[in-house]
Amino acid sequence: MAQITEVAPDLFRITTFLEPFNLQFSQFLVRDAEPLLYHTGPRALFPAVKEAVASLIDVRTLRWIGVSHFEADECGSLPEWQQLAPQSDAVCSMVGKLVSVDDCLALRPAKGMTDGEVLETGKYRFRFLATPHVPHCWESGLMFEETQRTLLCSDLLHQNGNVEPVTQSDVVGLSRDVLVEYQQGPLANYMHYCTLTDPTLQRLAALQPKTVAT
């Protein structure tokens, strides 16, 4: 069963811990006039995530499905969600729309966003931030909710283990430990460093988010 935590007003973290992988998979539901589900989870977790979302909203009213980059835990069950919610559209970077999401997965054309574009869901405004290769993937893009100053930051600050849903402690060290650990196995180079990395991280820090949702 997924754990549900309200981490900011109307923003719910839905988390399933898979012990064999020592890893949490999290999705974020924004409860608003046009509900937004940021990340779908992989297909294997669709029943659990659907049950959690259904406890918060009528799943048929889901309007937006956020895809930060093209991996199973970000968008694996997108078709299932779009079948369940007939008015829902995927929202992703323009690169993601053009090179993968529309052709490989979405049942309907995705809303491709360019850097700085704003998506309004009702009370909340999500500014799209193009972040190619940060944390990974060419099509990567994050969302910053300007009303409550919440950064939906995808795999940035990734941590292993069944960690607490909300913390005010520094998690940079924990995230660095994961990167070092991953370098020893098949998940090496999980987040690489390139000329885009530092300016992108500096840009995100300059937003001064109150909440970082990862």
Which stretches of residues belong to each language-model region?
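Conserved beta-strand hairpin/beta-sheet module of binuclear metal-dependent hydrolase folds
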Residues: A2-A54, L142-C153
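Metallo-beta-lactamase
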Residues: E6-P9, D89-T214
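Active-site environment of divalent metal-dependent phosphoester hydrolases
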Residues: F70-C75, K97-S100, E117, P135-H136, ...
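A general structural motif
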Residues: A33, V59-L62, Q87, T147, ...
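Short, flexible loop segments at the rims of nucleotide/cofactor-binding pockets, characterized by
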Residues: R13-E19, G41-R43, V67-H69, R127-H133, ...
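Active-site metal-binding motif and surrounding structural segment of the metallo-beta-lactamase
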Residues: L45-V91
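Active-site neighborhood of phospho(di)ester-bond hydrolases with catalytic His/Asp-centered motifs
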Residues: Y38-T40, L62-F70, A90-M94, L151-D155, ...
